[in-house]
Amino acid sequence: MGLASVKTEVRLVTNLLRVQQLRAERDLPTTPQSRHLVFTGNPGTGKTTVARLLAAIYRSLGVVEKGQLVETDRAGLVSGFVGQTALKVMEVADKATGGVLLIDEAYALARGGENDFGREAIDTLVKVIEDRRDHLVVIAAGYPQEMHDFIAANPGLSSRFPKTISFPDYSDEELWQIFADLGEKAGYVPDPSAEAKVRAWFAAVPRDKGFGNGRLARNLFEDAVARQASRVVAITDPTDEQLTTLTADDIAPPGEGPRHGVEPAPTDERPPG
């Protein structure tokens, strides 16, 4: 769903690897390539999904041995005690070796002062990346400006993370398609009034740092299912159509966040007799 520009960037990365492998097999000169990447974008734009896909592609190309994806963040890498942060980084690196390590909100490692243990985590990470360059791929993810600051936090990061893939926010149309696809998979059909309200809901959401993208579409869908259940439970012997149809009454008003546990709405609906 969406991600056209991201798919193009992923193809560029993987095609380069494939051609370099072909050149090596034919004893042609090859250009050393850093496989580590920076992913920038708001939450819910598919960064983890693409990281998982890349891990599988890297394994199929023989870039990594196992192709597992290990996810972590500052809390998984930094300890509040002297000497423990490096050990935590090494422990996570051990789990990820042979696959891909995804560091979410990696910029948080660089936010403290000179004495912050996040700096120790970055220094250790740079050494791990160098020592395990043939066995580990690292993807650092976060907001664009913050990730720029992260790369600038250590002289060794810019050369090891030369490529950035930007994940744009989903359009209103793409968010509607995500909502509709979730409904199709779960056995729910939005009627025209529900579709119109869902589209209006997405159009009203501010595109700021808190914008949840695909997660927002999922939250709105799950909220609609909860609201529909509260509405349908009041119907005596509901029909299959009533059980599977989402109406405008089941969609949160534009500008209002999704919520669960709503009170059943009064209804005079009855199955056709």
Show the residue positions of the predicted features.
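Short glycine-rich substrate-engagement loop in P-loop NTPases that contacts/grips substrate
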Residues: 66-96
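The conserved phosphate-sensing helix
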Residues: 4-7, 206-233
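Flexible beta-alpha connector loops of hexameric P-loop NTPases
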Residues: 74-85, 108-119, 164-166
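Conserved catalytic/switch belt of AAA+ P-loop NTPases
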Residues: 107-139, 143-158
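Conserved C-terminal "switch" segment of AAA+ ATPases
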Residues: 61-66, 146-152, 158, 167-211, ...
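Pre-Walker A (pre-P-loop) alpha-helix and adjacent loop at the N terminus of AAA/AAA+ ATPase modules
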Residues: 1-35
